[in-house]
A protein has these predicted regions:
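Conserved ATP-binding/catalytic motifs of P-loop helicase motor domains
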Residues: 1-229
């Protein structure tokens, strides 16, 4: 035992519950384990530092179920959130094709993983967003972190991606689809923890429960960035 260790645990209990949790209807917020780890201390923040007050108040528990699609814009942007992997794959294909067409370049084409139904055929070029599917200690890649393709070197058979801190990571082309998904569109679950300071579009909104709505909408720093189609 090391009683001198102090835990600082931060989180949002309104976000999505653990996937395939082994315990049903667990009250994590008021659990004895969390109480013990934090020495009985809990600070409840009352001011949102991520978004504007309008969006914050809209997402309060007493208001969130009154939200309607018409409360937001309905544009197709360059960034997307979807509920299902089927829709995610569909939107990513649309965006990849559009990007390649607009840039008028020859894309690097890679096939989907035959063992993973959530993988997809990709057409890659520089500037495309990708998200890590898993950790890679060797390559210093972290699961669910987003990256941008900086360079594709076909002769060397490798791709360099850049993270948010502008650190570069080089990945062998044959390993790329094992490590990354294209990330024009990501699922609501994958978006947890992200902050969007650019316009984005939410898909399949009619399938969202209260927690899914909360996560998808609270990514924005400004209510005017949100589009629902």
């Amino acid at each position: 035992m090391m009683p001198e260790i102090k835990f600082i645990i931060a989180g949002d209990f309104s976000q999505l519950l653990p996937v395939k949790d082994r315990i049903e209807d667990c009250n994590y917020k008021d659990s004895m384990a969390l109480h013990e780890l934090c020495d009985g201390n809990r600070l409840q923040l009352t001011k949102c530092r991520r978004s504007d007050a309008t969006l914050y108040n809209m997402l309060l528990p007493e208001n969130i179920n009154n939200i309607k699609r018409k409360d937001f814009k309905n544009k197709m942007t360059d960034r997307h959130i979807a509920f299902t992997n089927k829709k995610r794959i569909e939107i990513n294909k649309i965006m990849m094709d559009q990007t390649i067409r607009n840039k008028k370049i020859k894309a690097l084409e890679l096939k989907a993983l035959d063992y993973d139904p959530n993988s997809q055929d990709v057409r890659l070029c520089t500037g495309m967003p990708v998200i890590a599917r898993k950790n890679s200690k060797q390559l210093h890649i972290f699961n669910n972190e987003t990256y941008t393709i900086k360079e594709i070197r076909r002769k060397e058979d490798e791709i360099t991606v850049e993270d948010g801190g502008r650190r570069e990571h080089t990945v062998p082309i044959p390993e790329f689809t094992k490590i990354f998904n294209v990330a024009y569109c990501i699922t609501v679950h994958k978006s947890q923890g992200a902050t969007f300071d650019e316009a984005y579009t939410i898909h399949e909104f009619n399938q969202y429960d209260e927690r899914l709505k909360y996560v998808a909408l609270s990514r924005a720093t400004d209510i005017n960035l949100i589009n629902i189609i």
